A protein has these predicted regions:
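Glycine-rich Rossmann-fold phosphate-binding loop(s) that bind the pyrophosphate
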Residues: 1
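Redox-cofactor binding/interface segments in oxidoreductases and associated redox assembly factors
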Residues: 64-66, 107-108
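Conserved NAD(P)H cofactor-binding loop of Rossmann-fold oxidoreductase domains
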Residues: 68-70
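N-terminal Rossmann-fold NAD(P) dinucleotide-binding loop
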Residues: 5-6
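C-terminal substrate-binding/catalytic lobe of Rossmann-fold NAD(P)-dependent dehydrogenases
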Residues: 123-129, 137-225
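Rossmann-like NAD(P)(H) cofactor-binding subdomain of soluble oxidoreductases
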Residues: 78-143
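Aromatic pocket-lining residues of Rossmann-like dinucleotide-binding sites
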Residues: 12
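Conserved N-terminal Rossmann-fold NAD(P) cofactor-binding segment
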Residues: 20, 24-62, 76
Length: 225
């Protein structure tokens, strides 16, 4: 589960959304260590049973989050990971379908759009049971960038399309507390909208590359998203 999986598990523990969480990793000792470490924080949040297990434990789960996959290396795009990560999915998903699992399958690995489709095809589950994280992280990054000038919780804007280099911001629907973003900027004395929007979009699109170059992987943002 490594960085992304462990960060998501930590975020879920803090939210107290579940009464039980099982961690599965090819390195079982790693999953055990993460479960122990997370469990030691439970006195400060909601009661929850966190433990390391294997696929026989997932039959009664309401939600399975798959984060397994090769990480982007500096200079790689998400699409460069397709062959490796589809291969990993092919080793994981059949172990899930072999159980009586009837819950939701969520994919949080790259390239997430391709892998979500692959997971649905491999599993045979109906499309309404297989989801990907999509552009939720990109949307959070956009709201953060705009929100550096205001409270980001007041910013309403979305990124659509691929979670990757072809993603697109929907500026026409962007607003701050219900005020159209362009109008809001003019009220604050800022009129160079197009140049600023293009710069913000590029910062959002390229932010993963910037983070990977500096620390090797991204995981906190997607865990919160």
């Amino acid at each position: 589960m490594w960085f992304c999986g462990a960060s998501i598990a930590f975020a879920l523990m803090q939210k107290g959304l579940f009464s039980e969480m099982v961690l599965i990793d090819a390195n079982h000792a790693k999953a055990e260590g993460e479960a122990m470490d997370l469990s030691h924080g439970l006195p400060y949040t909601a009661s929850m049973d966190i433990y390391a297990g294997d696929y026989k434990e997932v039959a009664d789960c309401g939600l399975i989050i798959i984060t397994a996959g090769a990480n982007q290396k500096p200079g790689e795009t998400r699409l460069d990971l397709i062959e490796k990560n589809v291969g990993i999915l092919k080793s994981i998903v059949p172990q899930i379908t072999a159980t009586a699992f009837e819950g939701i399958l969520m994919i949080v690995a790259n390239p997430v759009d391709v892998l979500t489709y692959a997971a649905q095809q491999i599993s045979g589950y109906p499309v309404e049971r297989v989801f990907g994280s999509g552009t939720v992280l990109d949307t959070a990054r956009l709201k953060y960038q705009v929100g550096r000038h205001v409270d980001s919780r007041s910013v309403h804007a979305v990124i659509i399309g691929e979670h990757g280099d072809s993603e697109l911001p929907v500026w026409s629907g962007a607003n701050v507390s219900g005020i159209d973003l362009n109008h809001f900027c003019e009220l604050r004395g800022h009129f160079n909208h197009e140049a600023s929007m293009e710069r913000l979009y590029e910062e959002v699109r390229d932010s993963a590359y910037e983070i990977i170059e500096r620390k090797g992987a991204t995981y906190y943002g997607i865990a919160m998203a």
